[in-house]
Amino acid sequence: ILVNEGFTVPVWHENGTIGKKKTRKELHVFSPGTNFNVHEKKEETNTIACYVVTKHDKGFMKKNPSIYFGCAAIDIFTGNTKLFQYSITSSNIHNHNVFDELERFNSIYNPSETIIIHNYDEEKKIDDIIQFAGLQTKSIHVISELIDSDQSRMVEKCEQQAYQKSILTDFYNDINDYDSFIESSNLSRNPIAYKSFCFLLDFIFQHNPNLTHKLNHPTFDNINNRLVLANHSLRQLNIVNPHNVKGQFSSIERMINKCVTPMGRRNFRDIILHPVNDIPYLKRQYKIVDYVVSNYEKFEFMRKKFKTIRDFEHLYRKIIFNKIS
């Protein structure tokens, strides 16, 4: 109940019996984005996100100020990991249009817990950013890089190449060649997103080390053929549910998502929320849809079979945690 209301709840385990010296050890820390409840799975995803927002003022060589965004999101139910980085240079970097891409990323992955790391010296501007980007999560942690704290020191650590290598190779033991991996995964070309990713991995590990086991390799949302969505398009067109309202007709995505397996519903949502402008690809998809609709009787038996398939991605995570039953 406390976690669902946005609280962070540490759980301590007590050893020893009456008459003997008792010891207590922190078992796990539960929070909205790190709560893996195997007994009560109401949603098909549970995502925690970290957003690094860094501004650079104008100077002798720069006529206008810039703002950089590094985004990382991890779904603890499936182990999927998504990253995104972008920057904007403008005379006015504090208006809602500047945060359109952050709002898009947040709307797509809809985290239940969010970490905001920033270098602003005005707290009011962070409140504005939360409003601009529509961050309506159960729990929001705000970390200033300008204020000395354990968390800000960890943020600084996540910028160091040696620490980045250490944390990545610790959590992904299938990486044989680190340099090749960060090149092929685009981490080396997106340092702000990499920094955000490292901090998020450590944050989750501190809550529950099991949640960082067997995560999928990070993939970037920076796709060249992706349709640009501005002015909060996904929310304004009601493609996604802007207020987390329940029900089939709470958004267009939920209304048209008729997939019968959890994996299918997640994949369908991912496709709908990542529209592309690649014409050959779209034509191929239209042909496939047209063929299936025209020959639906050939596929109807498959749909009935699919209804018996359980959530394999979630089951795999349960196996990792030794909670399968």
Describe the residue ranges of each PLM region.
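Charged catalytic and DNA/RNA-contacting regions of genome-maintenance
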Residues: 1-291, 304-307, 311-317
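Conserved interaction-surface patches within small, structured recognition/assembly domains
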Residues: 296-299
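C-terminal helical "lid" subdomain and adjoining coupling/linker elements of P-loop NTPases
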Residues: 320-325
